[in-house]
């Protein structure tokens, strides 16, 4: 009986997670642009409230980016570890 694992799929999934994390920067900038367009809500673009919101938004995006990127790295590492273990076990049976 042959078992065929697709470790490349696991690596690709991890890479996709990391790529999506990278795309967050574009979304972040688009939201900042919208916030600045509606800055009158906070008392103007230079107001402490507007700048505070932008700062907090940046922190939130940074946390999300770091977590998504780290998760993608872990998925890729797990796939690599499984592939190496499978290869080692397979060669020991040969």
Curated annotation (Swiss-Prot):
The keyword Secreted applies. The keyword Secreted applies. It holds the Pfam family WXG100. Its main location: secreted. It comes from the Bacteria. It is found in: Secreted. InterPro entries: ESAT-6-like_Myco, ESAT-6-like_sf, T7SS_ESAT-6-like. Keywords: Secreted. GO terms for cellular component: extracellular region. Belongs to the WXG100 family. ESAT-6 subfamily. Forms a tight 1:1 complex with EsxW. This is ESAT-6-like protein EsxV. It comes from Mycobacterium tuberculosis (strain CDC 1551 / Oshkosh).
